[in-house]
Amino acid sequence: MKKNLLPGFIAIFILFLFSCSNKYYTASNFEEKTENHKVVAILPAEVTFTGKQPKTLSPDAIAKAEERESIDFQYALMNSILNHANTKKYITTVNFQDINTTLKILEKNSISVRDSWNKDDNELAKLLGVNSVIRMNIRKQRYMSDEASYGVGVARQVIYKTGIGSKVPVPSSVGKTYDIYASCNLLSDNQTLWNDNYKRSTDYDVQPNVVIEWITDDFGENFPYKEKRKKR
């Protein structure tokens, strides 16, 4: 009996590993294209809020919130990349332009945060004096208010405590506030050299800064420009 169960457990374990693995793209000629790269700049992230927006917020207020999160994502990605940059096994082969320097150069050239989202990647790289740029695209699809999400969460707990939940399953996604879709691209000469993407649902009890850390930590961990340390 135990021998018959073993293959099933192994299959489930392998499926679990594949479901947890992160799939990202790296260009086949990445090493060739980046051989002479020295400096990389992180651009302000393009952040858009879609779905049911709060009635108390004007379009202008929503736009300002998008731009604030744009900068938050920019700084958070820098921190994440640096946190994962040099390990016992790997070293990072490029330097990163300071975020303040990037923003000052854009401002000096009359390029706002929002304007930078639509500027040509190659032109921005030349303007910033870097070999490649990193772009993030974040879309936050809102389904309900935090208050409504909280109410659904409480109702779900009541259902489970009464025992009804075991007979009538309640999907965990019912009370979600947002679906977040994120992508991160490394671009040089208008070519995508590396890409990673991320999707996650959140509800009322997850703070925005936590979501930003989740996403950027994933991108930072998988970011390229790494080579194995040479043994001494």
Locations of regions flagged by a protein language model:
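A generic structural signal for short, solvent-exposed coil/turn residues
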Residues: 9-12, 32-34, 85, 176
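Contiguous N-terminal and early-domain "leader" segments and peripheral loops that mark the onset or edge
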Residues: 2-3, 20, 40-41, 59-65, ...
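N-terminal segment of the mature soluble domain
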Residues: 48, 52-135, 139-142, 189-198
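C-terminal/domain-edge helix-coil "capping" segments
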Residues: 20-50, 127, 140-232
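Sec-dependent bacterial lipoprotein signal peptides
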Residues: 1-20
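N-terminal start-of-chain detector that recognizes signal peptides
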Residues: 12-16, 104-108, 153-158
